[in-house]
């Protein structure tokens, strides 16, 4: 947050998303409201609504930010076929899991309750599936590895493997 003498505090859209992420990590997705974000950022509700018209818009922006970061990790590595791709997917998942906890995951689960958000997520996964396509044994093994990674991710974010014994891969 930036302050100037004689003026109310101002904060950028990205700054608000940073504060929103912190709120979710500390208090969970249900604590993320326009009012709570305004209070945490030290600005008015109108200041938040200037950047995010609704809570849904705010949550969608958070998920888009996370997805963009994850996609950037995938695209940073040149991949030649399903095996290389799944290796980069595993590395990106490992990196992103270090920043993810059950409270953040709860927000993502609630995000998927909206049919439009679910459609967007399905479209994202279709892009992943396309990169794992093929009839070769390597492509099939890459798909099995993908399913295993996704299963480990679900165990971790749902708090089933609290100590990370099974999900530390």
Label for each model-derived stretch:
Residues 89-93, 104-111, 145-152:
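Short alpha-helical scaffolding segments that buttress acidic/His motifs in well-ordered protein cores
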Residues 59-66:
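Alpha-helical DNA-contacting segments of helix-turn-helix folds
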Residues 96-105, 109-125:
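Conserved, surface-exposed functional patches that form binding/active-site neighborhoods
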Residues 1-11:
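N-terminal intrinsically disordered/low-complexity leader segments
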Residues 68-105:
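Hydrophobic alpha-helical connector segments
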